[in-house]
Amino acid sequence: MSKLSSRQQAIIEFIRKEVRDKGYPPSVREIGEAVGLASSSTVHGHLARLEKKGLIRRDPTKPRAIELLSDEDRFQDNFEDSVVRVPVIGKVTAGQPITAIEDVEEYFPLPDNIVTSDKVYMLRVSGNSMIDAGILDGDYVIVRQQHVANNGDIVVAMTEEDEATVKRFFKEKNHFRLQPENATMEPIILEHVTILGKVIGVYRLIH
């Protein structure tokens, strides 16, 4: 955070004093009188810069709605601005296919540099067929919704029996191969497959 000017520091201290003594913040006019600013637009300019620095929060619809933010408040605001809440949808297997459940169970915060569109969701993995790719039983895969995939992509795929599974995708002559990342398991060979999304990340709780 950049250093405050003496005027901005005076404004912060006056707001803090008024809230402490009176229980509510001062008006723009009162702030101007206290720090020697005759122009309300100049006061508004200082308040806007303080808000941009994360030191205050204002409600433009109310004349006295100026709130001083603590370090915790500023951290929370920055956190809220830098995350996107994505839906956690049902469960998907990394072993044998299971029916895909599309009901949203909850929403989970992810960094906005991962969630670059509104087509991202999470699924909980059940099974061990992707362990060699670092996807373990109980993990959550982060999935970008798309209906095409390149050979070698890890995807969530819907089989011919309308069941969803996480596998590595390969399009081969006359069929599709959904390849597990576990040497003890056989691939799933299908004539038709529907891609539900590409796995772009994994979230794991360490117990």
UniProtKB/Swiss-Prot annotation:
Positions of the DNA-binding region: 28-48
UniProt-listed Gene3D superfamilies: Umud Fragment, subunit A, Winged helix-like DNA-binding domain superfamily/Winged helix DNA-binding domain
Biological process per Gene Ontology, one example term: DNA replication
Top-level taxon in the UniProt lineage: Bacteria
Catalytic activity: Hydrolysis of Ala-|-Gly bond in repressor LexA
SUPFAM superfamilies: LexA/Signal peptidase, Winged helix' DNA-binding domain
Assigned EC number: 3.4.21.88
Enzyme class, broadest EC rank: hydrolase
Site positions per UniProt: Cleavage: A94, G95
Keywords: Autocatalytic cleavage, DNA damage, DNA repair, DNA replication, DNA-binding, Hydrolase, Repressor, SOS response, Transcription, Transcription regulation
Catalytic residues as annotated in Swiss-Prot or TrEMBL: S129 (for autocatalytic cleavage activity), K167 (for autocatalytic cleavage activity)
Matching CDD domains: HTH_ARSR, S24_LexA-like
Protein's job: Represses a number of genes involved in the response to DNA damage (SOS response), including recA and lexA. In the presence of single-stranded DNA, RecA interacts with LexA causing an autocatalytic cleavage which disrupts the DNA-binding part of LexA, leading to derepression of the SOS regulon and eventually DNA repair.
NCBIfam families: lexA
Family classification: Belongs to the peptidase S24 family.
Quaternary state and interactors: Homodimer.
Protein name: LexA repressor
Originating species: Brevibacillus brevis (strain 47 / JCM 6285 / NBRC 100599)
Gene name per UniProt: lexA
